[in-house]
């Protein structure tokens, strides 16, 4: 089985912890996006990114220094959002690192899809960006079915730990031979079970580590996940939707 996760907006450079092992599968398409971004004026980039002045200035500097072939960081270390902090890949055993290189995939608006040890550089390009002036009106259209085709080349089951924005790279291309199981983390709020974004990101990171450390091959094994006191809920789940619920007090964590 393959596991998909979303990238993070915050990126960092780390060339010391682990070596780069591979190149991104869709690097030729990434070069097209790089060329487009570098052809935009500062005002056009501001409109494209919809970011604060500080973030825009940082992103423009990143773009000026961008080199897709040199001084790269392994993708699993390049993203530093909540999910990646709780995943803590720098603490993985070697078997767990080998497992994620084979089975974990990071979806990306800029790179399409990444293996953990593909070499990347910092970028700013959300998947839902309106691509004014580009050859395609949206990145969903630009990437089309390529991500799904690659994902299901070796496996018929994908574990979805990505956000709704990124799972749209895969979901439209499912069929009777392609199965995707979405993982949902819920907690009780005002007598209703709800997904709290920050806590879900924490749990997704912990679950990736749980899967990797235990070298899981069968989706049913995921039901044994109990971090943050989450319990698999059979009554709320279905064949393609695993729901985990908790009464854990995140405020005290």
UniProtKB/Swiss-Prot annotation:
It comes from the Bacteria. Disulfide bonds: none annotated. Belongs to the UPF0246 family. It comes from Lactobacillus helveticus (strain DPC 4571). Transmembrane segments: none annotated. One of its GO terms (biological process) is response to hydroperoxide. One of its GO terms (cellular component) is cytosol. InterPro entries: YaaA (IPR005583). Pfam families: H2O2_YaaD. This is UPF0246 protein lhv_1883.
């Amino acid at each position: 089985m393959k596991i998909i996760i979303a990238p993070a907006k915050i990126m960092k450079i780390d060339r010391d912890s682990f070596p780069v092992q591979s190149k991104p599968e869709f690097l030729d398409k990434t070069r097209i996006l790089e060329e487009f971004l570098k052809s935009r004026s500062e005002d056009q980039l501001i409109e494209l990114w919809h970011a604060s002045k500080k973030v825009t200035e940082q992103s423009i500097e990143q773009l000026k220094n961008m080199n897709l072939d040199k001084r790269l960081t392994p993708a699993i270390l390049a993203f530093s959002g909540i999910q990646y902090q709780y995943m803590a890949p720098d603490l993985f055993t070697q078997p767990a690192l080998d497992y994620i290189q084979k089975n974990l995939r990071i979806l990306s608006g800029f790179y399409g899809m990444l293996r953990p040890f593909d070499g990347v550089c910092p970028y700013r390009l959300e998947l839902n960006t309106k691509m004014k002036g580009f050859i395609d009106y949206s990145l969903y259209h630009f990437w089309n079915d390529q991500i799904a085709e690659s994902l299901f080349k070796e496996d018929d089951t994908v574990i979805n730990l990505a956000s709704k924005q990124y799972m749209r790279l895969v979901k439209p291309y499912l069929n009777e031979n392609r199965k995707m199981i979405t993982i949902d983390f819920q907690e009780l709020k005002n007598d209703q079970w709800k997904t709290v974004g920050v806590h879900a990101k924490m749990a997704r990171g912990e679950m990736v580590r749980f899967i990797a450390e235990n070298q899981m091959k069968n989706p049913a094994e995921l039901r044994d996940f109990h971090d943050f006191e989450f319990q698999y809920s059979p009554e709320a789940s279905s064949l393609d939707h695993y729901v985990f619920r908790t009464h854990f007090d995140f405020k005290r964590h």
